[in-house]
């Protein structure tokens, strides 16, 4: 099995990259992909850059050139579910765009023409992720993760997301674009991220302060998940 892993930022990939054995680096289209073995399992780790376009381009390159069997999206996210705090884990059962609006033509808010309203994560990957969470006794929430090209740091933008997606558990900037690409290429995916901030007017301060905490927790989860997927 070959597992694709995608993180947007240096801080979100560095702990995993440092553990890859026989590591090789491939740079293409402005993104970096690190290949090798993570605890004996073949992995391809992509540092995509921030935002939907970067994430979609990177995911496409990863799938086209390295042919992963599954893709895990890792990193940080802003918490929307009331029970979440910094360092907690979110697992996607679905991903949607929070900044797409073609409702004038009869589509659901967040839905793009020719696409489903949401992109469903793989049930087996969700179950494996939740088993890993239980092993580490971490607080976690499974549900809808929404994505857009904005860092949510104000009451107006937050209220809009909560109005349009009251069931959303977390918000970030890449997951749905990755899910969209995986859907088109028929590659199973799951999003496993750690909370770096609660999406409010102080979220930029929390993000800077707690990104390292989120990166450590999400990397731990991904490493455990890779082992579980490879060895059961």
Curated annotation (Swiss-Prot):
One of its GO terms (cellular component) is cytosol. GO terms for molecular function: adenosylhomocysteine nucleosidase activity; methylthioadenosine nucleosidase activity. Its EC number is 3.2.2.9. It holds the Pfam family PNP_UDP_1. It comes from the Bacteria. It catalyses: S-adenosyl-L-homocysteine + H2O = S-(5-deoxy-D-ribos-5-yl)-L-homocysteine + adenine; S-methyl-5'-thioadenosine + H2O = 5-(methylsulfanyl)-D-ribose + adenine; 5'-deoxyadenosine + H2O = 5-deoxy-D-ribose + adenine. Pathway: Amino-acid biosynthesis; L-methionine biosynthesis via salvage pathway; S-methyl-5-thio-alpha-D-ribose 1-phosphate from S-methyl-5'-thioadenosine (hydrolase route): step 1/2. Substrate binds at residues 78, 152, 173-174. GO terms for biological process: L-methionine salvage from methylthioadenosine; L-methionine salvage from S-adenosylmethionine; purine deoxyribonucleoside catabolic process. Keywords: Amino-acid biosynthesis, Hydrolase, Methionine biosynthesis. The active site is at 12 (proton acceptor), 197 (proton donor). Signal peptide: none annotated. Catalyzes the irreversible cleavage of the glycosidic bond in both 5'-methylthioadenosine (MTA) and S-adenosylhomocysteine (SAH/AdoHcy) to adenine and the corresponding thioribose, 5'-methylthioribose and S-ribosylhomocysteine, respectively. Also cleaves 5'-deoxyadenosine, a toxic by-product of radical S-adenosylmethionine (SAM) enzymes, into 5-deoxyribose and adenine. Thus, is required for in vivo function of the radical SAM enzymes biotin synthase and lipoic acid synthase, that are inhibited by 5'-deoxyadenosine accumulation. Homodimer. Belongs to the PNP/UDP phosphorylase family. MtnN subfamily. This is 5'-methylthioadenosine/S-adenosylhomocysteine nucleosidase. The gene is mtnN.
